[in-house]
Amino acid sequence: MTVQQPKRRPLSRYLKDFKHSQTHCAHCHKLLDRITLVRRGKIVNKIAISQLDMLLDDAAWQREQKEWVALCRFCGDLHCKKQSDFFDIIGFKQYLFEQTEMSHGTVREYVVRLRRLGNYLSEQNISHDLLQDGFLDESLAPWLPETSTNNYRIALRKYQQYKAHQQIAPRQKSPFTASSDIY
């Protein structure tokens, strides 16, 4: 009588099946059409996945699967790529999702604008102290980029609402940070 060995498959095959089984972003719960696979806070691209030829049986895959998460492209960029620390982008995004009735597309527009502005202000070595003074769109007006100034002002006013909401309804420290170690 022979003992049957458990069936082993390459990790890349398990990941392909995993990728196709995911329907919603693990972070914002948006229905997925394009997917970003993340392992321990780092994006793993399709070329790297295709090279994962380690053989696993089903039990090993069950353990390994806990290390992987499927995100929409937007959340993948926000949570896994370096961000400027000028604004609390992750907290702002959560606020827009949880406290407003905005569509995912509108949230994305506000977040992208604020992220670009934060990167721009950091590159210009603008002091973070300006965030403490009154209305953000007025405080930062002299340093706003010349293109799309109104769009940046609108995003700053929405961010001001987020900051006011934080002061009115103080919550425990948010588990969402601007780094990639959220997993």
Curated annotation (Swiss-Prot):
The disulfides recorded in the entry are none
Q: Which domain of life is it from?
A: Bacteria
GO terms in the biological process aspect are: DNA integration
Query: What are the GO MF terms of this UniProt record?
Result: DNA binding
Cross-referenced Pfam families: Phage_int_SAM_1
Function of the protein = May regulate sigma factor activity.
> NCBIfam families, from UniProt?
FliZ (TIGR03823)
What name has this protein been given in UniProt? Protein FliZ
Chain's gene name: fliZ
